[in-house]
């Protein structure tokens, strides 16, 4: 039987901690419970061997991937370098291609010129071949003119083959008296006589037409339809009518060589050249003075009693209303 007072003392001792539990029970009844519990934060979680093997294989895969990435990066570096070299080479090739295209555009006129020269060479070859045939077909080369004249006197027409002295024979036949000459032969003789009259003097100072002479003077004048253009036309026409167009052009060039401009040369010639002294300026019919070239309208003056070109009066404009104005330089 348990003593109640003893049990009360034991209870109080246990409650107050004065009596150890081992002393009462001989062993701690919660010892097994303490052993089964795991202290917090002192020992890590323990994985099973299966999980540990799986973790190890994952680490290997990640490591392999890192190795593969590094290998690919090492391979891509030279590839990028080669691509950059290829791009630079392509840019250089493109530049050279554009340069070649530009040179081809420059060579194109040369090629066309080459074709033209080839055609000229071919034409010259044909002309040389015809010339060789020309000498052979005229009979004896020592007297081709006599042979031509004999054939012409006998038949009345030139021989069908080409002849070296054809022009000379035609001229002699046309100039001979008492001979019936056909129209074609007469025309050829007239043309030949004009050519035979060409001498050193006429060649150096040709009698130019008024239009050609005015165009030559225009090349030295600035602007268009100025009073000096009208003066050049008037002087050219007067010089052509007097047969001194060549001398007038020589005098014009002589003044230019002295350092004067074209306007000063025309003004000086209009006052000193003998063909223009005392010549009355021509009269030009116009509808009204508004049709006169605009650069000349400011130079229109009232017509004096006796206008002459050597006094600076170029021409006289006459309108349909009967009014007159003179162009003064």
Curated annotation (Swiss-Prot):
Coarse class of the protein's main subcellular location: virion
Subcellular location: Virion; Host cytoplasm
Entry keywords, A to Z: Coiled coil, Host cytoplasm, Transcription, Viral RNA replication, Virion
Mutation effect (residue 72 to H): In strain: Isolate Sanchez
Coiled coil: 70-120
Gene3D superfamilies named among the record's database cross-references: Filoviridae VP35, C-terminal inhibitory domain, beta-sheet subdomain (2.10.10.70), Filoviridae VP35, C-terminal inhibitory domain, helical subdomain (1.10.8.950)
Record keyword Coiled coil present: yes
UniProt protein name: Polymerase cofactor VP35
Gene name of this polypeptide: VP35
